[in-house]
Amino acid sequence: MPTWRYIFSLRSKSSFTKTWVPFTQIRNSSKSPKVGQKPILQGALGPPLDFIRPKEKVTLPPLLKEVSFQQKKFADCVLLTKVGNFYEMYFEQAEKIGPLLNLRVSKKKTSKSDVSMAGFPFFKLDRYLKILVEDLKKCVALSEEVIRPVDDLSSKNMYIRSVTRVITPGTLIDENFMNPYESNYILTVVFDPNFFSSDISNQGTAEDKDCFADCKIGLSWLDLSTGEFFTQDSNLQRLAGDLTRISPREIVLDESLKSFTTHPIYSFIQERKYFLSYVENRYQSLDCWNKFLEKEIDPSFIKYCTKLEVTAGCTLISYIADRLQNSHPNIQPPIRVSLNEYMIIGESAMKGLEIRSSLYQNRYTGSLLHAINKTVTKSGSRLLTRRLCAPSTNIVEINNRLDLVEKFKLLPELCSKVINLLKKSNDTHRILQHLLMGRGNSYDLLKMADNFSITKEIHSLLSPLESSSAFRLLLLNMHPHDELKQLINNAVDENALMKQKINEEEETEVIAQEAEEILQDENAQVEIVKKSLSSEFDIRQSFKENWVVKSNFNNNLRKLHEKLQSLFASYDKLQEDLSKRLGKKATLRKSPAKLYYVHLKLSGNETIERFIKKFTQAVLFQSTKSTASFQLPGWTSLGMDLENTKLHIHQEEQRVLKSITDEIVSHHKTLRSLANALDELDISTSLATLAQEQDFVRPVVDDSHAHTVIQGRHPIVEKGLSHKLIPFTPNDCFVGNGNVNIWLITGPNMAGKSTFLRQNAIISILAQIGSFVPASNARIGIVDQIFSRIGSADNLYQQKSTFMVEMMETSFILKNATRRSFVIMDEIGRGTTASDGIAIAYGCLKYLSTINHSRTLFATHAHQLTNLTKSFKNVECYCTNLSIDRDDHTFSFDYKLKKGVNYQSHGLKVAEMAGIPKNVLLAAEEVLTLLPNTSKPTSMK
């Protein structure tokens, strides 16, 4: 007859289900029935009176429940859950993201339904984070097992699963895929609250639109990998240039902006393809920043910082703290960027002059940065990039930099020695940040010690120059920190670290192989787990550690290591005793499943009997035909002592390493000064090398309005031509000298007009970063802004034609250029009819001549402008030309700028060079003679 009983079913490692099922019991079935007596069936029994049959409720296993909860909580993220040695995705995320990562999507069977899942080994996390965060522009949440807080009594489990960090492009810290040569900024943009209440952006008067362009904006940005923190007051018309200069990896906007998708600012940011995040703007007092800062905010910052900047900073810090979850961000005190401190290079100029990337394919190769960058350290390269995007306007600062470059140029042997030492140095900025955020390791400590040694050597090399003002401040900041170096070297065992690295690589290979087996066959995971549980190790190997801290560093470690050696001696003695009594058939072993036991190879029952006689306390717990396993109290006690001693050594090492780390970070102020000094040396020596190799000259940088360049060259073009063994044709330029501040340049296409315009703007930029310049002589008066109107393209995203883009850029220049600005304009008015274009170009020239008074290079094909501007006393005409061989009708460009006007643009010649069919050229030549206001072309025959 049926009765009922509880059945327990294992659903997962930490989950059981309990149900009542029918069960027929036979009375006395546990005993042998008497002869002739049949078993008596037990009467029908029901479930307990208080039992109420529950409704069948099918639920997910606890792990998947937690995953589902976290996916809802972090709805904007791809959730990666660490399970054993894997990071896994589940449900729809596995189906959508798995194929993008080239991962196999499988089904995990549950009582509720089959659940999609995909995963990868934990040591490949950086590889897949790069794809998710950098390539796919996804936000990633990492869920891992962490120790349950003491006050959390919701479960008896020691560990809970929690999201430990949310990773976005702007919140990277020490990931291997970070570009070490570029800053990793996250930027918050906060607009004036009234900005979105008006619609003057799309309609209204010109004055209304000017008000719109002047709308106040607060900016705040930081690099978590270095702790650098900045704020700036800006406005809408400068925002594009600010974004190009800062080049953030991520922009944080107020969530209310999501509802303004038709607003111009939304499309303005969207079209630049930044990674966007949205949060609620927060305004708090500056006091709330202090708990995240290394030291208190400078009073001058508090005095000048605007409310919008404070809001941007509060929003950014709050966002960072939320993304880091349990980690504490460590940030340097904020620096307020003032427009008066650096040369402003707008978005158009940054692109047109190819400062960071080439116009062709938008690549690093072919850019100005690529042409001049000879730095040998990662942090030096980052600093050079920042300076190139925001050259200084401080004459004293510029000349101090030039002094350093000149000294190293005059002392090439010293320069070479310093460079060779810098090549061996490590990224102090990012290493220190790792330590400050509690993410450092023993390798970081050794790298820091290496930097101290290198600093001491460099300091020794430069000491004879201490009397020079150029080196005095550098040497003051280059503290070698001998005591910290000694502390690290006394503690950290470098050889052990190397062995540890080798062991980790070997373990990684094993895990990778097992992972591949699991991916190929789902049942392989069970076999691998069984294998790991039953595997047996050599005792010395199982207790062997590549200890990070030297055993003689302090008394505690010395005693613990002595105790460990004593325990190993006891182990050897016990093993020797076993061997004497039982031979080599008996060994002391340890395994995850059996813990500490004695393993016997059996040759008959006498072996077991002999063992029991010799070791009366031994307990047999497992045997086969050929082996037997015994628990021996003496070995169990010894094994536990070994384990505890090993644990105590590990704890003491962690205490020592933390103590050393705390000591290092307590010197963070001087260490940051040291890092800055090494960066300064890297840039100075690299620019000295550049000047030596490329024949650059020291410019005179002063407070005048002069731009005097003799035999100037374009560094990017010159570098490209040198690969083809073609010499670059240099040219002079004199604007801002005396009464003349505008050069009106005519000449044919391909004759070098645009190159000439760009090279002079670049020479100003190089001079103000503290570099020598490509010329035989140069005098540069401080430039406050560089404006460039060279080449435009349709902006289909905002439904603007090429001509409209050109006119907007021109309008921006005319409204913002000052007497200290340097303006280059090429072919203004080319996007409309000839007469309209000439009229617009003339109007611009007149405005620049009478209102702006900027140093200006103005190139045009409209030679009529030279006649229209004859009355302008501050305008001079220069031209380029080409040479024609009358015998064979060939021509070539001489690229030399001469005083005068070229009335022929030779467009047909350039068309011929481009391969335009002969008949087309003849027809064009014929009709050209019939058009009014044209010059007679050179014969094509």
Curated annotation (Swiss-Prot):
Origin: domain of life? Eukaryota
List residues binding ATP: G747, P748, N749, M750, A751, G752, K753, S754
Q: Which SUPFAM superfamilies match?
A: DNA repair protein MutS, domain I (SSF55271), DNA repair protein MutS, domain II (SSF53150), DNA repair protein MutS, domain III (SSF48334), P-loop containing nucleoside triphosphate hydrolases (SSF52540)
Q: Which SMART domains match?
A: MUTSac, MUTSd
Fetch the InterPro entries from UniProt: DNA_mismatch_repair_MutS-lik_N (IPR007695), DNA_mismatch_repair_MutS/MSH (IPR017261), DNA_mismatch_repair_MutS_C (IPR000432), DNA_mismatch_repair_MutS_core (IPR007696), DNA_mismatch_repair_MutS_N (IPR016151), DNA_mismatch_repair_MutS_sf (IPR036187), DNA_mmatch_repair_MutS_con_dom (IPR007860), MutS (IPR045076)
Give any single GO term for biological process: mitochondrial DNA repair
Write the record's keywords in alphabetical order, separated by commas: ATP-binding, Cytoplasm, DNA damage, DNA repair, DNA-binding, Mitochondrion, Nucleotide-binding
Location in the cell reads:
Cytoplasm; Mitochondrion
PROSITE patterns, A to Z: DNA_MISMATCH_REPAIR_2
Q: What PANTHER family does this protein map onto?
A: DNA MISMATCH REPAIR PROTEIN MSH1, MITOCHONDRIAL, DNA MISMATCH REPAIR PROTEIN MUTS FAMILY MEMBER
For this chain, the family text in UniProt reads: Belongs to the DNA mismatch repair MutS family.
Q: What does this protein do?
A: Involved in mitochondrial DNA repair.
The molecule here is called MutS protein homolog 1
